[in-house]
Amino acid sequence: MDNRIDQAIIWITVLALVTAPLFFSFFDFVAVFNEPKVVMLHFTSGLVAILWLWQIVLNRINSRSATENQLNWDLLSWVGRNPVRWALIAVGIWVFAQLASNLLSPLPIISFFGGDEARSGYNLYDSLSLTIIFASVAFRFRSFKTLQILAYTLVITGTIAAAYGIAQHFGWDAIGGNGGRTRVISSFGNTLNFGGYMVMAIPATLAFAYKKFNRDRTALVIVTLALALQISGIWFSGSRGPIVAAAVSIISFFVITASLGSKKEILKSLAMAAVATVITAIVGTLPSEHGDVGLQRVISIGNQFSAETSSTDIVGGLSGRFNIWESTLKMATQWDLPIEEPTANKLLRPLFGLGQDMYVYSFPLAGNPQTTLALVDHAHNYELQLLIEQGFVGFLAFVSSAVLLSLSVLVMVQRMRRSNNGIDTAGFLVLALSPAMLGKMVELQTGVARISDLAMNMALLGAAIAIYEVVNSRLSVEEPEQAASNTIKPSSINISASNQMVLGSAVLAAVLVTAIATSIFVSWDLRRLSASRTLAVGYEAPTVEERARTWAKVQAQAPERESFTFTLFEQYLSTAEQQHALGNTKEALRLLNIGRDMLLEYEQRDPLEHDTQIGLMRAATTMMVWGHLEFAQELGDRAIKQAE
């Protein structure tokens, strides 16, 4: 039973890592492009957590007959000089910072579930789900076999996504309707996320030059073609940050290869990379509507450092990011929110931030003046995003874990080099997973990560822990003297508990997590997915009456979905104005009041949402134009609130 649960957890984790990059609203089967990714992440991570806890319960039940079944755990002895275990401590602090950030949030419900489905990856629900994926890989993928499965997953999903992106570049996309885009998005919904995923996939695919296959030449040809597809994909994404990060990941790949392999092995991967690059160049010269967008974007990289502008408007490229970063750092000195809050909360803001998913609401308070209504919902730097939303505790915890895991790669490569084993299975795994992690860390400095690429990123962080433990254990067997010298004496930080106490705690945790996770998934994810499916089916109904019934049903199913609510409000407002122009004033008032009431209901959940406030001001303005001057005060109050 224990082994079956282990296998279930491993394959459910793999399912999460496949669906995060590849799932979306195929053939418009739901109304929101990336919703299937989010739902599957919540489902798989919840299932992993439930299985894991019940496995602990079963193990404790089975150990009742054992003579030594008491829990004894010495923290410092366990951590020792092991960098990845210190990284696990840092991740634990990071999770604590997220929980504290949510508790202190001015809008805890928004911080837990998120305000907008387009901002995935930063609310607590998404963050905890991603952390479970991280933990699953870190603790359950501790064998060469499971780590190879992870490497295969990254390469295969990256190749499929790249092939789809290339098809979009040349005008074909019968699946998602995104053919002929200037910069392709593949199955990700955003060019940056697609490019960010290729940053991880490219070095992992390069590593397969050293994988032993039964038919080496055929396999090498397939791997080279896969690499060519991935390089072409990131090229057609036109994402400068990911292209630079991919270069860093490739450089780190060859640095590690030079440390572990022979000249012949180095030349083998260099040749594969060269052939793949030539294929990419050929693909890039093929005629398409938008030409060679990759070349144009790469040439413009140098201009990003010399571009000067006196405008404070948010624009693309580095100048826009410098603008955002300047305002973000200003936010980290003020910690202002657009609502009044208790003094105690204000004092804790530097430690635990403004609250998860709160960046978008506070940015206008520190941002430079804009000539347009440009909302910034991300710092375009992952660490700065964490700093603002999770404070210095969350920021330092994540940075510490990332630094420690990067250090673990260096330590591991040095030990492997001394062992003189060359690029064996362990070396292959280090090359497949470590440069991918390092390259992604670079990409996060200018990217806008979402769960489509964050899921694999978290898996790679977990893999850094797993592979270090596996390789370190193997090398310790080969170097027993050094292993003995690394033994840490017992410390005073020791946790002891009887098996009965551990069993009772595990049962309580398993029951609570099962009930809470199931309840949240059914009441939140499935309900919203059902509403999205209803809208997708009825969106193009043949009659106005059928479409109206569809929208009414969707609104009743998911009144908290701002994108649905605001779109429906605009429909009511437009129809009301048409009816008023035709002289049907009563019908016009009825329709406008229905739309206004929807926004007022949504305002109770999220009083800071920008579109909602704009919509309510438009409703008040329309009422005044129609002669209802009693809305003048409301309009004035809302206008002042928005200006402030």
Listing of model-derived features with the role each one plays in the protein:
Residues 1-118, 132, 136-156, 208-226, ...:
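Transmembrane signal-anchor hairpin modules in multi-pass inner-membrane enzymes, especially those
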Residues 1-23, 43-56, 88, 92-102, ...:
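Alpha-helical transmembrane segments of multi-pass inner-membrane proteins
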Residues 22-36, 108-117, 175-187, 306, ...:
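Juxtamembrane membrane-water interface segments that cap and precede transmembrane helices
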Residues 63-68, 106-109, 169-181, 298-299, ...:
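Peri-membrane helix termini and adjoining interfacial loops of integral membrane proteins
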Residues 190, 310-376, 383, 390-397:
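TM-adjacent membrane-interface loops and short helices in multi-pass inner/ER membrane proteins
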Residues 222-223, 227-230, 534, 550, ...:
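Alpha-helical solenoid repeat scaffolds, predominantly canonical TPR units
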Residues 523-541, 556-583, 600, 604-627, ...:
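Amphipathic alpha-helical repeat scaffolds of TPR domains
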Residues 540-552, 585-597, 629-638:
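Helix-turn-helix repeat elements of alpha-solenoid scaffolds
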